[in-house]
Regions:
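Conserved HGGG/HGGXW glycine-rich cap/lid loop of the alpha/beta-hydrolase fold
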Residues: 8-72
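Active-site loop/oxyanion-hole signature of alpha/beta-hydrolase fold enzymes
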Residues: 59-102, 276
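Alpha/beta-hydrolase
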Residues: 150-219, 226
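Catalytic active-site module of serine/aspartate enzymes centered on a nucleophile-bearing elbow/loop
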Residues: 254-284
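Short beta-strand/loop motif that positions the catalytic acidic residue
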Residues: 224, 230-232
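Conserved hydrolase catalytic core segment
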Residues: 93-137
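Flexible "cap/lid" loop of the alpha/beta hydrolase fold
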Residues: 121-160
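Acidic catalytic loop of the alpha/beta-hydrolase fold
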Residues: 235-239
């Protein structure tokens, strides 16, 4: 992986918003998920830097991006406002945009509200809502993993009371992390260790938890005009094929790709498939 360059700029309200720039070629703006996590977990985005100039945003309150003064300022409209300021900072009339997980929800909101600003859109392991169908699929995926040695602790972590401090939240998040993989073994545990020490922003997670029950973007998706790729892992326990199918049906002309033997961390579980599918779509 080439050396990356950490860059930043001042937002209209005086915060520093930072991003990592690496690679060469057409610009691909990447909004990671979490929320509240830095994009360190995405690594080099499956080597897409070999084909594109990656602009990997540190969302507000993560990495080298300042936290807003208001601890509640982590709503989707807040994130899309930052994304628009990033586009303006880059001096681009249109952007190719990849949103991953929570970042995929941000990307949907942005592309639906500003369709003229998005040239191509990649929605990776994300969803338009977490309704009954999605919740049922998640529960089935959790039960499918019940025989794993890590299951008891990971499942318990998801049922405990909400922790208070950022460190407690990070501990809970990492205990539950094995669910994000189709297979969780020593290699996956070693990968988690590479970013286990990254700070986590509990405020962002708390706001997201409040928004989830009412999240439903289906009525907005017809406004998206950019060619769109919807990609997820076959074994993704939270944003899997059920979520992908709903997105694909609602976004005009969207293309769907389901990656076998991959969960929510498809970008690191099946990097070659992820790279090839995304690169082929963006250059087609």
């Amino acid at each position: 992986m080439p050396d990356s360059e950490l860059k930043g700029f001042a937002t209209a309200d005086g915060r520093k918003l930072s991003y990592r720039k690496l690679g060469t070629g057409p610009v691909l703006v990447c909004h990671p998920g979490g929320p509240g996590l830095s994009p360190a977990y995405l690594g080099d985005l499956a080597g897409l830097w070999t084909r594109f100039t990656l602009i990997i945003l540190n969302p507000r309150g993560t990495g080298a991006s300042d936290r807003p003064a208001d601890p509640h300022a982590y709503h989707f409209d807040d994130y899309t406002s930052d994304l628009e300021e990033l586009r303006q900072h880059l001096g681009l009339e249109q952007i190719m945009l990849l949103g991953y997980s929570h970042g995929g929800v941000v990307a949907q909101v942005y592309a639906a509200a500003r369709p003229e600003r998005v040239r191509r859109l990649v929605l990776a392991v994300t969803t338009a809502r977490l309704g009954p169908e999605q919740q049922a699929a998640t529960q089935a995926a959790i039960e499918k993993r019940s025989g794993q040695p890590w299951f008891e602790d990971a499942n318990a972590a998801g049922q405990e009371e909400d922790p208070e401090t950022d460190d407690q939240i990070r501990d809970q998040v990492f205990r539950r992390m094995p669910f994000n993989f189709a297979r969780f073994g020593p290699a996956e545990a070693a990968y988690l260790d590479t970013w286990r020490s990254e700070p986590i922003n509990g405020d962002a997670l708390r706001v997201f938890s409040e928004e989830v029950p009412s999240l439903d973007l289906r009525s907005r998706l017809a406004n998206i005009t950019a060619p769109t790729l919807v990609i997820t892992g076959l074994e993704d326990y939270v944003c899997g094929p059920v979520c992908a199918a709903e997105l694909t049906a609602a976004i005009p002309g969207a293309r769907e790709v389901i990656v076998a033997d991959a969960g929510h961390m498809v970008v690191v579980e099946q990097p070659l498939s992820f790279h090839d599918e995304v690169a082929a779509f963006l250059t087609s």
